[in-house]
Amino acid sequence: IEQCEPVAPSSLVTRLLDAGAVHPAPDRTTTFTESDVTVVTPQLRTSPSSVAAGDGRVTIDVGSAPPLAGATIRLPATGGPAAARNAGRSVVDTDQIAFVDADVETTEGWLEPLLAHFDDPRLGLVAPRVTGERASPLDLGAEAARIRAGSRVSYVPGAALVVRAAAFDEVGGFDATLRFGEDVDFVWRLDEAGWWCRYEPASTVWHEPRRSWRERFRQHAGYGTSAAALALRHPGALAPWRSNGWTAFAWVALLAGAVGPAAVTALGSAAALGPKLPDVPRSASFRLAMRGHLFAGREAAASVRRVWWPIVGVGAIVSKRFRWVAVAAVLADLRSAPTDIAYGWGVWQGMRRHRTWAPIIPAVSAWPGRTPRPE
């Protein structure tokens, strides 16, 4: 496995794949070809670009004016992307369905790396890398991953997805009551039903960026409005910050000005990791733990920009320390700060609508080394 050489199937390999510790690099498929896939494209009334109906794909016209010539199905303007994708599924008879939005450009051969994964019958969905706008939340990077709530790649955008038809039917498709976040909800329900979902950046597609900052703000705020509904449907899955008790205490102490206790906690917990990993050199385990502390700090800064900024902003009115926190969070990623703040605006709108604080509550795990006492 370490040398990226072929390995025989085994229970250990299955456990590692299931945990997302390793990722498959399958040979090009011998089971499925592009003829086993039907492309479904919702053409929304407000789409910034359009596709040519009649190019072999199933095109769902959602309230276009004038109507899209050659569309397979027409829906009223009140429909959304979830309803359009579900309608497209009703006329598909292939084993796989590729849902591709109208503002996404694909390249020749983009399906081949994705279809190779479907040789594994446990695979329900695979998504390509979506490139386009710099620092876009749609671009999830160059590393393959298992998609699972709370993991490194906890979601994939619905801009381009290839889904096994049987998996789609088992979970009932997309939830048409969700105007935003229906793609995240769909992937999480597939995972909860036992289907593996994978992110495969060996395949890339291009997503047309929004044309103005105003459109980008509206787009990101729209994404944010889905957070409350998703947090209620999938408790704990949308926590803005995840940490263990030692790391959380160290950062809270530092922000409170208690530099000494923060340093002792961070260094002490890093040193304590060594005896728990006897096969790893102490220096390596120490560096690993310290990197974990630093990574948690970056994630906390991202949470300030994205969902905690109203709280930090109020605190900054009366506290110099809160003002420093706000400045540090913005400087940590200056480029994404405007769209992060727009996303947070949407999150708070959704929280008000659904009357819940769930999207801004962090998840702090048990203190490392401590196990719950049996009842």
Task: Give short role names for the model-derived ranges.
Residues 1-54:
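N-proximal low-complexity "stem/linker" segments adjacent to membrane-targeting elements
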Residues 16, 159-163, 167-172, 177-204:
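A short, conserved alpha-helix in the catalytic core of glycosyltransferases
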Residues 75-92, 147-155, 159:
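Glycine-rich, basic loop-to-helix element that forms the pyrophosphate-binding segment
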Residues 97:
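Short aromatic/hydrophobic "clamp" motif used to bind/position activated sugar donors
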Residues 101-105:
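The conserved acidic donor/metal-binding loop of glycosyltransferases
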Residues 108-138, 208:
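Conserved donor NDP-sugar-binding/catalytic core segment of glycosyltransferases
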Residues 132-133, 145-166, 179:
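A recurrent flexible, glycine/aromatic-enriched loop bordering the glycosyltransferase active site
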Residues 200-201, 206-265, 274-355, 362:
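Active-site-adjacent helix/loop segment of glycosyltransferases
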